[in-house]
């Protein structure tokens, strides 16, 4: 029997030897060399380990004529920044070559010294030994006591990343050129001042020498000059020559800025000096005039001194410091500019490139970037390029235009022009020219939602009201449609025709078919406004509550004119309006205290339900609605008192709208977080003008803090999604709490989810201690409200409960949230409590990225015209709405409440670009009668 070893003995070696496997060569682009500092324990993501400093910094050095190259100061001025980095050695490296080499002295053919104004030189140097690379900006300053009147300096941006220096060379060059021009302008100013002082000294010395020479002449009786007289004469001639030389130097240094008039690198303040100098005459040869003339600034009187004959340019003389060489104001500006440069280029190269690309894209996305982007970070130098004279930081922001300058939009558009799943009453408030205040009321279409859900959450107030002789009454029943009728007692009152189809379905049960919602106006020139307006305006809305035990009915809004007696309505209808009626026909014109509106045709009787009706109009768009303008100025005081019975005193006082809310006391803290509005006490609606302050003086620290607080809110509160949805959909969120610091912190965090109305306005109120009014919900979409435990705070809670169905309320003390239900998918991706993001700045960037995607969807929905316009004449509004909804759900992938978010952003885009002055559009006051749910932890 053959064993295994025998079998092995009979086999050939070739059978067991496998053919060698030759691996394919790795492509060159995938060949990554080993990290050079891997043996030192460094990670590949850290900066070059060969560097002896921890972060980038700026070094200012000088080539001193006494000690050679020496460092002067660093920015930031902290020894921990550059660590063990040898500043003296590196100063020797960057100042070893005179890049500013120029002849200063007596050029050929000239008897006087000439200043050669050389341009700055810019070089890039590297030191592999120190692991440092630098952008070096060489410049020359002038010193009267220095050799050749010049002092060479350089400013260097030192970094461990060579690619950062090379790729950011243009940006570094531009920023350092600004700092250099500012420093040199201050130096020329100081140098001219030194020349003027020197001329005064020389003039005083010449006077003394003249006096001494005359004394010696009188004392000399021999008729020939002594050696002392000859020495005095030579000294006097030297002084005369020095005066001429210094006058020529002063003329040169003063004429330099005129050559820079067409330049673009003038620092702030330099243009003012140029204009002052251009208006004055040139320096004359008279030393008295040149000494007394000060073209730069008013200085205190200078006492001249006698100049010795010996030269003062000795090595034992102490040279001026950099601060002494430059004017104090300009030196401070230069240091601020250098600090700005250090902060601007701080961070990795990838971060800088991403930020630059982001700013470039923001300039291109000027259509949607006003919603969520921070415009302070969009290159501020665009303003400087547009203005010939740079202004101070406080003057960079655009001035707030007055009411007279705010143009009135010609096209009126409603935020609720789309068909919503809830009934919505939208009220547009406009400020007309002059002192009169007009309001627009738009009653939009009604759609159905769950009847039982409506009974639980829809709160209708049952309050009586006394109607005046010229009141407007809106009645609605199950079968009524939107119409207007005219009563016999109001022959002098003309009513606009605004026929509109109001489609509604069953939303509640009623016991009587005549049950209706009444909108009663007690003033001659009023529009139809909700019940809550009685707090601030002499008008009222009374909504009768739906009875649960009755026949199935519908809430309908119908416009009509009622006689003085309540409940008496004239039966009739109005004929169709011609299609030529313009939208301006709906705007009332007031004359002699009456509302003058277009005339109405004859009435037609409707026997069916006792109400007037009107067929739909094809030319009317559903977003135009029913509009009536009224004036608060002409309100009847007596009817005002009648309509305000039963309300708190703080709501009855019209001045409370101005005095009780911190209108003129907007704190500066709001501007450091997110800016809101600057209110005015001129009128009740004059405080709707957006603030002139930029929308959030956001810094990296502010973004980090806001992102971190937003992360804490998302992880701490399980109902964060409905709260964020309220902000994104335009529903005002009120943050209620006792601790002001906690409320402000949360409001600042949630402000990153609030869409803006314009470039310079953020509708955020960080802290309010007085009761809220209906106007507050027009201005603010995020409000921090103080909870007061004392009886004085009862008014605040009463007003908040009064408007609770219009707002979302986040109670920080009780950890509750009352707001509508949210079932979408957008907010969970935006604010996921299970996110692995730890840093606030990272989460802030994540939010900005998600909101940018959201804005792109809103842009597509807004400017796809085929979605909003009928394709043919016979296409109904239902088909247009169906096409819009199909685009939102199928094309954009939106579900449930996410549709409302995109629709709201789209309406903001429309409002923003329908205005003649974008950014100054008045926000829309929007009411959504949707059921609210109470969330608890």
UniProtKB/Swiss-Prot annotation:
Residues that bear Phosphothreonine: 796
InterPro entries, alphabetized: FLCN/SMCR8_DENN, Folliculin/SMCR8_longin
Keywords assigned by UniProt, alphabetized: Autophagy, Cell projection, Cytoplasm, Guanine-nucleotide releasing factor, Nucleus, Phosphoprotein, Synapse, Transcription, Transcription regulation
Location of the uDENN FLCN/SMCR8-type domain: 48-220
Main localization of the protein described in the UniProt heading: cytoplasm
Pfam families, A to Z: Folliculin (PF11704)
Segments of this protein annotated with the region Interacts with WDR41 within the C9orf72-SMCR8 complex: 862-914
Residue ranges constituting the dDENN FLCN/SMCR8-type domain according to the UniProt record: 844-910
Region (Disordered): 274-293, 384-405, 564-645
BP terms from Gene Ontology: autophagy; negative regulation of autophagosome assembly; negative regulation of exocytosis; negative regulation of gene expression; negative regulation of immune response; negative regulation of macroautophagy; positive regulation of autophagosome maturation; positive regulation of TOR signaling
Known tissue expression: Expressed in all tissues tested.
GO molecular function, one term: guanyl-nucleotide exchange factor activity
Domain cDENN FLCN/SMCR8-type: start-end pairs: 318-835
Record's comment on post-translational modification: Phosphorylation by TBK1 is required to promote autophagosome maturation. Phosphorylated by ULK1.
Biased composition (Polar residues): 276-288, 388-403, 574-583
Taxonomic superkingdom: Eukaryota
Biological role stated in the UniProt entry: Component of the C9orf72-SMCR8 complex, a complex that has guanine nucleotide exchange factor (GEF) activity and regulates autophagy. In the complex, C9orf72 and SMCR8 probably constitute the catalytic subunits that promote the exchange of GDP to GTP, converting inactive GDP-bound RAB8A and RAB39B into their active GTP-bound form, thereby promoting autophagosome maturation. The C9orf72-SMCR8 complex also acts as a negative regulator of autophagy initiation by interacting with the ULK1/ATG1 kinase complex and inhibiting its protein kinase activity.
Family membership noted in the UniProt record: Belongs to the SMCR8 family.
Subunit and interaction comment: Component of the C9orf72-SMCR8 complex, at least composed of C9orf72, SMCR8 and WDR41. The complex is formed of two protomers, each individually consisting of one molecule each of C9orf72, SMCR8 and WDR41. The protomers homodimerize via an interaction between C9orf72 (via C-terminus) and SMCR8 (via N-terminus). Within each protomer SMCR8 (via DENN domain) acts as a bridging protein between WDR41 (via C-terminus and N-terminus) and C9orf72 (via C-terminus). The C9orf72-SMCR8 complex associates with the ULK1/ATG1 kinase complex. Interacts with C9orf72; the interaction is direct.
UniProt-recorded name of the protein: Guanine nucleotide exchange protein SMCR8
Source organism (scientific name): Homo sapiens (Human)
Gene name for this UniProt entry: SMCR8
């Amino acid at each position: 029997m053959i064993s295994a070893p025998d079998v092995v003995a009979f086999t050939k070696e070739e059978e067991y030897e496998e053919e060698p496997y030759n691996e394919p060569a790795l492509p060159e682009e995938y060949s990554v060399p080993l990290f050079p500092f891997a043996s030192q324990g460094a990670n590949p993501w850290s900066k070059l380990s060969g560097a002896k400093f921890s972060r980038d910094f700026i070094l200012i050095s000088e080539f001193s004529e006494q000690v050679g190259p020496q460092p002067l100061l660093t920015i930031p001025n902290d020894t921990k920044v550059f660590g063990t980095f040898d500043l003296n050695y590196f100063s020797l490296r960057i100042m070893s070559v005179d890049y500013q080499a120029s002849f200063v002295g007596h050029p050929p053919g000239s008897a006087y010294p000439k200043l050669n104004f050389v341009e700055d030189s810019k070089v890039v140097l590297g030191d592999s030994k120190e692991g440092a690379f630098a952008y070096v900006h060489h410049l020359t300053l002038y010193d009267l006591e220095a050799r050749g009147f010049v002092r060479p300096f350089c400013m260097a941006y030192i970094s461990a990343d060579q690619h950062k220096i090379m790729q950011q060379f243009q940006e570094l060059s531009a920023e350092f050129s600004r700092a250099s021009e500012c420093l040199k302008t201050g130096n020329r100013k100081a140098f001219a001042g030194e020349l003027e002082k020197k001329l005064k000294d020389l003039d005083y010395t010449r006077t003394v020498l003249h006096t001494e020479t005359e004394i010696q002449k009188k004392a000399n009786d021999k008729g020939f000059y002594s050696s002392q007289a000859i020495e005095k004469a030579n000294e006097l001639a030297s002084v005369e020559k020095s005066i001429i030389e210094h006058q020529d130097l002063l003329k040169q240094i003063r004429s330099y800025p005129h050559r820079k008039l067409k330049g673009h690198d003038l620092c702030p303040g330099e243009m003012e000096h140029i204009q002052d100098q251009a208006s004055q005459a040139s320096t004359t040869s008279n030393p008295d005039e040149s000494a007394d003339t000060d073209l730069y600034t008013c200085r205190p009187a200078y006492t001249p001194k006698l100049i010795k004959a010996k030269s003062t340019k000795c090595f034992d003389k102490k040279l001026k410091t950099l601060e002494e060489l430059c004017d104090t104001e300009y030196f401070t500006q230069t240091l601020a500019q250098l600090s700005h440069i250090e902060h601007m280029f701080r961070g990795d190269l990838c971060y800088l490139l991403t930020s630059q690309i982001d700013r470039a894209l923001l300039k291109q996305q000027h259509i949607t970037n006003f919603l969520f982007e921070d415009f302070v970070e969009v290159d501020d130098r665009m303003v400087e390029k547009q203005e010939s004279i740079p202004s101070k930081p406080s003057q960079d922001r655009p001035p707030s235009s007055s009411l007279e300058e705010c143009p009135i939009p010609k096209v009126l558009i409603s935020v609720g022009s789309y068909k919503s799943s809830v009934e919505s009453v939208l009220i547009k408030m406009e400020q007309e020219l002059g002192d009169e205040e007009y309001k627009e009321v738009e009653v939009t279409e009604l759609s159905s939602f769950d009847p039982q859900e409506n009974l639980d959450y829809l709160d209708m107030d049952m309050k009586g009201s006394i109607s005046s002789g010229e009141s407007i009454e809106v009645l609605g029943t199950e079968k009524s449609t939107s119409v207007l009728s005219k009563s016999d007692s109001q022959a002098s009152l003309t009513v606009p025709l605004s026929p509109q189809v109001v489609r509604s379905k069953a939303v509640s049960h009623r016991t009587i078919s005549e049950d209706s919602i009444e909108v009663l106006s007690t003033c001659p020139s009023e529009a139809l406004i909700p019940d809550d307006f009685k707090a601030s305006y002499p008008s009222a809305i009374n909504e009768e509550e739906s009875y649960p035990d009755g026949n199935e009915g519908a809430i309908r809004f119908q416009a009509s004119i009622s006689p003085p007696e309540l409940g008496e309505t004239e039966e009739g209808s109005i004929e169709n309006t011609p299609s030529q009626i313009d939208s301006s026909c709906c705007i009332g014109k007031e004359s002699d205290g009456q509302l003058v509106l277009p005339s109405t045709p004859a009435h037609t009787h409707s026997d069916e339900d006792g109400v007037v009706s009107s067929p739909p109009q094809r030319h009317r768009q559903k977003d135009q609605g029913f509009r009536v303008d009224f004036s608060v100025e002409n309100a009847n005081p007596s009817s005002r008192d009648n309509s305000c019975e039963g309300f708190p005193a703080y709501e009855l006082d019209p001045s409370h709208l101005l005095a009780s809310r911190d209108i003129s006391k907007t704190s500066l803290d709001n501007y450091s977080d997110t800016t809101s509005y600057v209110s005015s006490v001129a009128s009740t609606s004059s405080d709707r003008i957006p603030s002139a302050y930029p929308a959030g003086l956001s810094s990296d620290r502010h973004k980090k803090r806001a992102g971190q607080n937003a992360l804490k809110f998302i992880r701490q509160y399980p109902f964060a999604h409905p709260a964020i949805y309220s902000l994104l959909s335009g529903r005002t969120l009120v943050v209620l709490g006792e601790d002001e610091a906690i409320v402000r912190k949360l409001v600042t965090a949630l402000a990153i989810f609030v869409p803006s109305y314009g470039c310079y306005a953020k509708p955020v109120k960080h802290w309010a201690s007085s009761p809220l009014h209906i106007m507050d919900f027009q201005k603010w979409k995020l409000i921090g409200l103080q909870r007061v435990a004392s009886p004085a705070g009862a008014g605040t809670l009463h007003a908040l409960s009064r408007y609770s169905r219009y707002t979302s309320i986040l109670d920080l003390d009780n950890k509750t949230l009352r707001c509508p239900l949210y079932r979408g998918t957008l907010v969970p991706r935006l604010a996921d409590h299970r996110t692995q993001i730890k840093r606030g700045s990272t989460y802030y960037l994540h939010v900005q990225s998600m909101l940018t995607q959201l804005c792109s969807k809103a842009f597509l929905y807004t400017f796809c015209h085929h979605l909003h316009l009928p394709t043919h004449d016979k296409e109904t509004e239902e088909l247009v709405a169906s096409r819009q909804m199909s685009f939102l759900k199928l094309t954009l992938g939106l579900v449930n409440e996410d549709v409302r978010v995109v629709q709201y952003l789209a309406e903001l885009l429309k409002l923003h670009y329908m205005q003649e002055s974008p950014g100054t559009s008045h926000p829309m006051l929007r009411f959504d009668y949707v059921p609210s749910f109470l969330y608890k932890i």
